[in-house]
Amino acid sequence: MNGGICSICGLPKELCICEEVAKEQQRINVKVNKRRYGKEVTVIEGLDPTDIDLEDLSKFMKSKLACGGTVKGNSIELQGNHRDRVIDLLATKGYTVDNIS
């Protein structure tokens, strides 16, 4: 988005709903992987980085869950098993629960 105008729809940022539409269309997969020494990592996949700022979403989740994490490629990795709480947080951010598995 450049200078207050959305590059996708051409509307001002205040009226743009591109991000809301993108949230409704995405199929998100939340899973827990085991790493070395029995550590668990919650991985959130299926997010489109062109429509949504993954860094901001990651920062929001890390602060709400009080954990560390990172953005790797098109996924967010959070330290620990936070699967249920991540689904609740995504729902509060406007993602449809039916599209989260």
UniProtKB/Swiss-Prot annotation:
Pfam families, per database record: SUI1
Gene Ontology MF terms: mRNA binding; translation initiation factor activity
InterPro entries: DENR/SUI1_TIF, SUI1, SUI1_arc, SUI1_arc_bac, SUI1_dom_sf
PROSITE patterns with a match to the protein in the record: SUI1
Keywords: Protein biosynthesis, Translation regulation
Family under the similarity heading: Belongs to the SUI1 family.
Protein name per the record: Protein translation factor SUI1 homolog
Native source organism of the sequence: Methanospirillum hungatei JF-1 (strain ATCC 27890 / DSM 864 / NBRC 100397 / JF-1)
Lineage: Archaea, Methanobacteriati, Methanobacteriota, Stenosarchaea group, Methanomicrobia
